[in-house]
Amino acid sequence: MPHGTLEVVLVSAKGLEDADFLNNMDPYVQLTCRTQDQKSNVAEGMGTTPEWNETFIFTVSEGTTELKAKIFDKDVGTEDDAVGEATIPLEPVFVEGSIPPTAYNVVKDEEYKGEIWVALSFKPSENRSRGMDEESYGGWKNSEASY
């Protein structure tokens, strides 16, 4: 399995279902890669076609297969509304090294709620040896001692 750095460029979303009945939505995205969570800025007043153009970095390790992108509408005084979620498979970027901006379906309760545009790139870790750094498994090393 790949170990390395995943760069995620959160570009935009289109055709989102409006979760705010009185005003334009203020959408933001929570990105989750295994146990790592990162949030985008709030696209204030951008409604159903927000643009973020933000870059996020995740550390990829054994068993990482997908990235989740959950879209929320920021509300003041009440809990933020969940707009929907996209599941982005990572195998293509592990093979290709980079994926240009691509649309992924946003769904909620198995219903289509729009699309999110994301670009991906992956840089494998260097000097990986069975998942351990050389120094962590007691490899022989020249002594710095002088006599």
From Swiss-Prot:
Domain C2: 1-103
GO MF annotation, one: RNA binding
Positions with a binding annotation for Ca(2+) 1: 20, 26, 73, 75
First and last residue of the signal peptide: none
InterPro entries: C2_dom, C2_domain_sf
GO biological process: defense response
Positions of region (Disordered): 126-147
Keyword terms, alphabetized: Calcium, Metal-binding, Plant defense, RNA-binding, Transport
Residues bound to Ca(2+) 2: 20, 73, 75, 81
Gene3D superfamilies: C2 domain (2.60.40.150)
Coiled coil: none
Domain of life: Eukaryota
Cofactor: Ca(2+)
SUPFAM superfamilies: C2 domain (Calcium/lipid-binding domain, CaLB) (SSF49562)
Its biological purpose: Binds to both sense and antisense RNA. Can also bind sheared DNA and dodecamer DNA with a low affinity. Interacts with mesophyll plasmodesmata to mediate its own cell-to-cell transport and potentiate RNA trafficking. May play a role in plant defense signaling.
This protein's name: 16 kDa phloem protein 2
